[in-house]
């Protein structure tokens, strides 16, 4: 038996009596080839699941083995209507997220989704966040693969850091350690709740219905932005997310302000920070620099995780306090992950895509997770169904934010910073400095 952490116990004591489904997180793999038969799938899952921690245990005052574990209670099978395109897949993912996990059984589900176009099928792994401290959804997915290598999603971001902007505390340490990220931020957020400004967010009342969408970006394009500006993939992703929410606010006729949106952002294995997204800036480079600087500053001053030192009952009370906060307190959760070390295969078939699924937990109405797989960086987005009428605006804004940064990362674009302008000024005669026109602050092409 394994002892619960303070965070696990806190969430257990604060469990939503209506079994709100938002505390589930997951990952979806799109697999090439025909879907296996139920008997084939059952044989493989039975063989591989029982060796994975937590998958045959239940959560009480500690993790205990579940008597009479039955795999069939955890496997669901659905078929997409024609044409079986991406939109239908996203609807199926949202449907799976709406179904709450049974707290009296092991806290995970596996959904087999058939009927994808191009002779493909998908497997969705959904777990409760309390399992994520020991086994993430992506790690669980990797353990189900043919090589059963739990290190497939190990830290291997492969982004070269350019001094002096390299940040050892990049938020890519693991994809789905969400129980620690969310709950650590929950405790911090509850303590700061009184000082939060009242803002209008692109979110409304939390419902049990969900929407899901994904945005894909070529990884080479992200790498080019990182090298051009000396930032991390985390910074690039958050800057694109910022453009997405700025687009939503402008679409609603609201003026983006410096205090419009907070984001829960992972900093290490045991803590989280709550910086504001700089939605007030229209200049994409200024947004990127601001995100980078705030990430570094927040990482340096972030204290040790409250979860390691908070009494169980106090942690539960803090979580309850956050649950009662106005919906606009926090509106987005940004997470990230390294790419798998190798191409994954399941039952002899290649995994073509892997999509991350963030939670919309408690009062976090919109979640955005980022995962790198193959040659793509994927933004997975979940939102309350009724509170996400502008989800397409959010998607469009993320795509626009990435497109603007990629265009600016081209080698033919010169960026003029204050240091560059000062150096240029010193190189000119004093008379020329007095008479020359001012240098534009944006960029010049040559």
From Swiss-Prot:
- GO-annotated biological processes: biological process involved in interaction with host; glycerol metabolic process; response to hypoxia; response to nitric oxide; triglyceride biosynthetic process
Record's superkingdom? Bacteria
Any transmembrane segments, and where? none
* Active site residues per record: 129 (proton acceptor)
Q: Which Gene3D superfamilies match?
A: Chloramphenicol acetyltransferase-like domain (3.30.559.10)
Q: What is its EC number?
A: 2.3.1.20
Show the segment(s) annotated as Disordered.
425-446
UniProt key word Transferase: yes
Q: Which reaction does it catalyse?
A: an acyl-CoA + a 1,2-diacyl-sn-glycerol = a triacyl-sn-glycerol + CoA
Keywords from UniProt, A to Z, are: Acyltransferase, Glycerol metabolism, Lipid biosynthesis, Lipid metabolism, Transferase
Q: Which GO cellular component does the record give, naming just one?
A: plasma membrane
Pathway entry:
Glycerolipid metabolism; triacylglycerol biosynthesis
Record-level Gene Ontology MF annotations: diacylglycerol O-acyltransferase activity
Family label: Belongs to the long-chain O-acyltransferase family.
Q: What is this protein called?
A: Putative diacyglycerol O-acyltransferase MT3481
């Amino acid at each position: 038996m394994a002892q619960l952490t303070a965070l696990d116990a806190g969430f257990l004591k604060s469990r939503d009596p209506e079994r709100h489904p938002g505390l589930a997180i997951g990952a979806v793999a799109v697999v090439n080839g025909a879907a296996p038969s139920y008997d084939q799938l059952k044989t493989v899952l039975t063989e591989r699941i029982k060796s994975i921690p937590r998958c045959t245990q239940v959560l009480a005052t500690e993790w205990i083995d579940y008597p009479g574990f039955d795999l069939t209670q955890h496997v669901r099978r659905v078929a997409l209507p024609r044409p079986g395109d991406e939109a239908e897949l996203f609807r199926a993912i949202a449907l799976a997220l709406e179904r709450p996990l049974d707290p009296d059984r092991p806290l995970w589900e596996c959904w087999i989704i058939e009927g994808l176009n191009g002779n493909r099928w998908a497997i969705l792994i959904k777990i409760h966040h309390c399992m994520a401290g020991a086994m993430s959804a992506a790690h669980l997915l990797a353990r189900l693969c043919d090589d059963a290598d739990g290190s497939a999603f190990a830290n291997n971001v492969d982004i070269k850091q350019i001094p002096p902007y390299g940040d050892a505390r990049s938020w890519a340490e693991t994809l789905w350690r969400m129980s620690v990220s969310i709950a650590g931020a929950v405790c911090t957020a509850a303590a700061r709740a009184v000082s939060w400004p009242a803002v209008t967010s692109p979110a409304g009342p939390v419902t049990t219905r969900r929407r899901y969408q994904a945005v894909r970006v070529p990884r080479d394009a992200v790498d080019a932005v990182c090298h051009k500006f000396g930032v991390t993939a985390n910074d690039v992703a958050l800057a694109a997310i910022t453009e997405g929410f700025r687009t939503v606010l402008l679409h609603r006729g609201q003026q983006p302000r410096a205090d419009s949106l907070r984001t829960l952002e992972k900093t290490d294995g045991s803590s989280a920070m709550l910086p504001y997204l700089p939605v007030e800036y229209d200049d994409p480079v200024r947004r990127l620099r601001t995100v980078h600087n705030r990430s570094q500053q927040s990482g340096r001053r972030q204290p040790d995780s409250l979860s390691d030192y908070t009494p169980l009952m106090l942690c539960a009370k803090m979580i309850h306090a956050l649950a009662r906060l106005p919906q606009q307190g926090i509106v987005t959760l940004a997470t990230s992950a390294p790419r798998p070390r190798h191409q994954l295969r399941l039952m002899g078939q290649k995994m073509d895509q892997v999509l991350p699924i963030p939670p919309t937990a408690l009062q976090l109405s919109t979640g955005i997770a980022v995962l790198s797989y193959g040659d793509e960086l994927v933004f997975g987005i979940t939102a309350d169904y009724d509170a996400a009428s502008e989800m397409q605006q959010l998607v469009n804004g993320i795509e626009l934010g990435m497109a603007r940064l990629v265009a600016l990362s081209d080698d033919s674009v010169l960026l003029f910073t204050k240091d560059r302008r000062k150096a240029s000024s010193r190189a000119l005669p004093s008379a020329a400095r007095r008479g020359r026109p001012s240098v534009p602050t944006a960029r010049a092409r040559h």
